[in-house]
């Protein structure tokens, strides 16, 4: 019964929503879900439509794998129906600047529905988030977390975003990437 229920739930929009998220993240790969498991357990496995038994990790780059995981997560969040906040820790690791931009836009779209907290060291991604939020008329509040070199706990710096000691250099790098 559990396996049938999971198949039914997948049939009621999970796969459609997942592919919609993949499209929003510029992932153009023929992926499909397979339901496996023994009695009492059910697993959802992601695979390629045309290639049996070849795991996506053998074909997709690390950045693409991360984007697939993000698409899967955002699909689960949407189908959950409870509008709870979500937290991301550096969601664009191993991504090129083009993928960072589409992820920023997708997360800003999610911020129209629920609170989205993003921790990142990536100034280019931060710039994409800021621009996407302004364009979508979504409230954006950036903060810098500072930490002294003596091992003491860090603090949220309410006055600096991004932090003044690297702002000029980081914005130059961000603008250069935006022009590419």
Question: Predicted regions: what is each one?
Answer:
Residues 1-59, 75-82:
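Extended helical coiled-coil dimerization/tether regions that scaffold
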Residues 21-25, 71-73, 77, 94, ...:
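Generic, well-ordered alpha-helical scaffold segments in large soluble proteins
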Residues 22, 68, 119:
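Conserved RecA-like P-loop NTPase ATPase core
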Residues 32, 87, 118-120:
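A structural signal for short, well-ordered beta-strand segments and their strand-loop junctions
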Residues 62-86:
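GG-anchored amphipathic helix commonly corresponding to the ABC/SMC/Rad50 NBD signature/C-loop
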Residues 85-94:
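Conserved P-loop NTPase "ATPase switch" module shared by AAA+ and STAND
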Residues 94-97, 101:
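Conserved D-loop-proximal element of ABC-family nucleotide-binding domains
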Residues 102-180:
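C-terminal lobe/lid and adjacent interdomain/linker elements of RecA-like ASCE P-loop ATPase modules
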């Amino acid at each position: 019964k559990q396996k049938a229920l999971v198949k039914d739930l997948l049939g009621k929009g999970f796969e459609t929503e997942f592919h919609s998220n993949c499209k929003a993240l510029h992932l153009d790969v023929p992926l499909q879900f397979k339901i496996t498991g023994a009695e009492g357990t059910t697993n959802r496995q992601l695979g390629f439509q045309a290639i049996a038994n070849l795991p996506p990790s053998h074909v997709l780059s690390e950045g693409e794998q991360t984007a697939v995981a993000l698409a899967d997560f955002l699909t689960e969040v949407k189908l959950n129906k409870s509008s709870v906040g979500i937290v991301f820790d550096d969601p664009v690791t191993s991504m090129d600047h083009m993928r960072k931009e589409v992820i920023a836009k997708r997360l800003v779209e999610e911020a129209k529905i629920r609170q989205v907290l993003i921790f990142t060291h990536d100034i280019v991604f931060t710039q994409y988030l800021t621009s996407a939020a302004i364009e979508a008329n979504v409230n954006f509040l950036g903060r810098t977390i500072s930490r002294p070199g003596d091992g003491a706990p860090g603090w949220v710096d309410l006055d600096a975003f991004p932090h003044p000691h690297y702002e000029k250099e980081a914005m130059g790098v961000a603008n250069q990437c935006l022009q590419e």
